[in-house]
Amino acid sequence: MGQYTASQRKNVRILLVGDAGVGKTSLILSLVSEEYPEEVPPRAEEITIPANVTPEQVPTSIVDFSAVEQSEDALAAEINKAHVVCIVYAVDDDDTLDRITSHWLPLVRAKCNPSLDGEGDAEAEAEGDTQREPIRKPIVLVGNKIDLIEYSTMDSVLAIMEDYPEIESCVECSAKSLHNISEMFYYAQKAVLHPTSPLYMMEEQELTSACKKSLVRIFKICDIDGDNLLNDYELNLFQRRCFNTPLQPQILDEVKAVIQKNVPDGIYNDAVTLKGFLFLHCLFIQRGRNETTWAVLRRFGYNDQLEMCQEYLRPPLKIPPGSSTELSHRGQQFLIAVFERYDRDGDGALSPEEHKMLFSTCPAAPWSYSTDIRKSCPINETTGWVTLHGWLCRWTLMTLIDVVKTMEYLAYLGFNVHENDSQLAAIHVTRERRIDLAKRQSSRSVYKCHVIGPKGSGKTGMCRGFLVEDMHKLIGKEFKTNVVNCINSVQVYGQEKHLILRDIDVRHALDPLQPQEVNCDVACLVYDSSNPRSFEYVARIYIKYYAESKIPVMIVGTKCDMDERRQDYLMQPSEFCDKYKLLPPHLFSLKTNKKELYTKLATMAAFPHLRQFGLMTEDPKLWLKAGLGVAAATMLGFIVLKTISAAGAHTR
């Protein structure tokens, strides 16, 4: 796929304005013909310079304005269409210089912001839009006719620049001698493609807060070993990622020397600190090398407004109907590396502070540490902190249910830069479910099980039991935090699979289930075996939603450590399962601390063609007829039979 860089503007439109007689038209004609025109028309026609003859390789349109031929409405339209406005004055005429501040700059501001003008301002106030940031069109001040004087107007122009932050640059030139003509249009191009104002505040002579924030994030991403320094290896990697060239040792030493000279704490242990890194970019901008800082920002996904580009955060991903999304091997390896970088004490778990630091390159953490990841994934049961296994489980969950969010956060964490590829390389799209059914085996490694049952049936305890080593700790526990999904891994015939238990919260027995609550890889219908009225709800759910579907179903009776009560229903649970050719009810209790239930659910999801397990358990030959492919050759069919048949036994 190749490296991704946020794209810059694909074309540039330059508008020249100024008082009559300052030489706007002459400048354009001199650029095109490379000689001074003897006869100058009132206005030059719009011209387009091809990309291959411009320094920035971007097609550029140059537009002339004449107050004699055009109206003020036409001027307003041209100002709004332009990407940059060149205000031209004559260096030998002080009146044209004075008119920059008395007329042209206020005019450009007003045309870009109609609300700054009388009526528009009242309208904006009525609509509550007074807080909107004014639009600042990039401006280049151009002093023409430098061949007529022996002094410079730069001191006067620099004073104007301090009052108008939208002024990107100023240049003195001559249409007659062709002095600085091409440079003038290059500065105009540069004002659009590599603007100064988003990066730097001229008056304060420091980086803008948005630029500083972006560069801090970039520094953290490049700090691979997490020591808050960029060593030679990290700087070289940064250089290659941003500019596709290595950093020569001599150049690197010179850069460090400049930083050391200007920022006492910019270098530490022969490595660049954050202060040194920020100073370096400030220096680039002060020396007119904006394109260097912009190249870095765009490589890390920033657009001209210093916001992360949507195409950088969310590359297009095609997911066929019936397919799901999982982390690829590269995605897992990257997340392991990120975890290990921020596990500063090396204890194999992320403390709340380490977790917060890890997501410091993101707008916010994608989940709550206390009420989400610690409740939905396996944790270190001694400290209550998130383990590497739990960390990967939470990413696996997010990738299945919200892959777009996964891609966004991979970008925030620097996947695109470290892997030199887009986040698509971190995502695996599984084959369609219909193909799994046809091949009689699932190729996926992540399955979703919907746990459905009446309130008080014990389904929440069953879901939470999936996450802990000792389920006895959950007995009598009141679950105050509502956790929708619980995820852990199980072994299915020697292969690691992730199983997500989604606790479907049903308030009333008669409430209909939504399609997204029904559709899953395996359904687990839970009733309280000690409550005579509990099974009826489960039976109705099965008949209404699953009897005619291809989704495998397991019926689970909880609280089997208590006296089993006869159910007030047409059939008892075992009779119901026989009738609908389901496995016998699996009896479950937290007190037994037995976890084969979760393995059986994952197995049923992995082999979706074996929907009617009740039939299969009666005749071993039917397992072979089911056609497990490789399983038949390796006696896997026998293992499946043995595993599933055990579901009929009571687990007390």
Curated annotation (Swiss-Prot):
Disruption phenotype: Flies die at early pupal stage and exhibit abnormal locomotion. Mitochondria in muscles and neurons are abnormally distributed. Instead of being transported into axons and dendrites, mitochondria accumulate in parallel rows in neuronal somata. Mutant NMJs lack presynaptic mitochondria, but neurotransmitter release and acute Ca(2+) buffering is only impaired during prolonged stimulation. RNAi-mediated knockdown perturbs mitochondrial distribution and dynamics. The chain crosses the membrane at residues 622-641. The keyword Transmembrane applies. GTP 2 binds at residues 453-460, 491-495, 558-561. Residues 642-652 are mitochondrial intermembrane. PANTHER family: EF-HAND CALCIUM-BINDING DOMAIN-CONTAINING PROTEIN 7. Mitochondrial GTPase involved in mitochondrial trafficking. Forms an essential protein complex with Milt that links Khc to mitochondria for light chain-independent, anterograde transport of mitochondria. Required for axonal transport to synapses within nerve terminals. Required presynaptically but not postsynaptically at neuromuscular junctions (NMJs). Also involved in the regulation of mitochondrial dynamics by promoting drp1-mediated mitochondrial fission during high calcium conditions, and negatively regulating fission during normal conditions. This is Mitochondrial Rho GTPase. It comes from Drosophila melanogaster (Fruit fly).
